[in-house]
Design a protein with these regions (language model features):
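Glycine/charged-rich beta-loop-alpha catalytic/anionic-binding loops adjacent to active sites
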Residues: 98-106, 132, 252-254
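A glycine-rich, Thr/Ser-enriched phosphate-binding loop motif common to dinucleotide/cofactor-binding enzymes
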Residues: 106-124
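Adenosine-phosphate binding glycine-rich loop
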Residues: 235-300
Length: 300
């Protein structure tokens, strides 16, 4: 009879690495899901159209299901098309945590944090490791990537100028950047490429964070005048005329140049490394500044 029911030793279930994807857009980003799996997540639990009011109960599902030593195997990734909503979701998640009932969390709505960080770290390295006192112009600097990049550069001591189509938007955003990151950020109008030369005059570093397929800075406006130029636009016509999409430290018109893919490849390294680190502890919060710390380690 015993031989008919052979003893089956108890096997401890594998503790899966679970990533809760809180996406403010109706359809959760497939891009973010794929990167999460490539970074080592075993399962991605995706929620779309997430609002502030949804966050607490979703977070409770993360923090009340595993014991203290296993809590690090659950993490949260906040994404979506709108960074301003993402920031609110991060705040709501942080408020739901208490004592050691928390899980590591990363904010990267629309890839804004990792893209901005990748650009800033590349710029810093190209300048010898220090941007303090450098005059840096961020064209289309009122968008999510531009504001994060400008903020990180200002925080590091750079003299930053952002451009905006509307002067009132530039003023409002520059004040918000200074409030969040500190430092000095000016704003100048730039409505069309014919105004670029005046808008970027006196700069040492040029970073374009403008919309896809819009050329903001003609070659004549920057050639021979800048030490570093970075264009985050990958769709022709590119944002800075004369910079190639694959540039990754190439020499262009006397400047060290980085194109969208030159920055994008490093952005992907940073993104994956950050996701991987979420599962090493249960109290990590990865926003612009802390993501930059990770990127600097990778750049060494």
């Amino acid at each position: 009879l015993l031989n008919a029911y052979p003893f089956q030793p108890y096997s401890v279930p594998v503790m899966l690495k679970l990533l809760l994807q809180l996406d403010s857009s109706r359809l959760p980003s497939v891009f973010d899901q794929v990167v999460a799996y490539d970074a080592g997540a075993d399962r991605v639990i995706s929620e779309g159209g997430v609002t502030e009011g949804d966050v607490r109960d979703l977070v409770y599902g993360c923090i009340f299901t595993r014991g203290p030593k296993d809590m690090k195997n659950t993490a949260i990734f906040i994404g979506g098309a709108d960074m301003s909503i993402g920031e609110k979701l991060l705040t709501a998640a942080s408020k739901a945590f208490f004592a050691n009932f928390r899980v590591s969390t990363m904010l990267d709505s629309n890839g804004s944090n990792t893209t901005a960080v990748a650009a800033v770290v590349k710029i810093t390295k190209a300048l010898g490791g220090n941007v303090k006192g450098r005059k840096i112009v961020v064209t289309a600097g009122t968008g999510p990537v531009g504001t994060r990049a400008a903020g990180l550069l200002a925080r590091a001591g750079a003299d930053v100028t952002i451009t905006s189509r509307k002067p009132e938007d530039g003023t409002r955003v520059s004040e918000a950047i200074c409030k969040r990151f500190g430092g000095t950020v000016h704003a100048v109008p730039l409505r069309e490429s014919s105004q670029a030369a005046a808008a970027i005059e006196g700069g040492e570093v040029l970073l374009n964070a403008g919309p896809a397929g819009v050329m903001l800075v003609p070659r004549a406006a920057w050639a021979g005048k800048f030490k570093v130029v970075v264009d985050l636009n990958a769709v022709p016509p590119l944002g800075i005329e004369g910079v190639e999409v694959n540039d990754d430290g190439a020499q262009r018109e006397g400047a060290i140049a980085f194109g969208a893919l030159g920055i994008g490849n490093f952005k992907m390294q940073v993104h994956k490394e950050c996701l991987s680190r979420l599962f090493t502890r249960n109290d990590l919060v990865l926003d612009a500044e802390t993501i930059e710390d990770v990127a600097k380690e990778l750049m060494k």
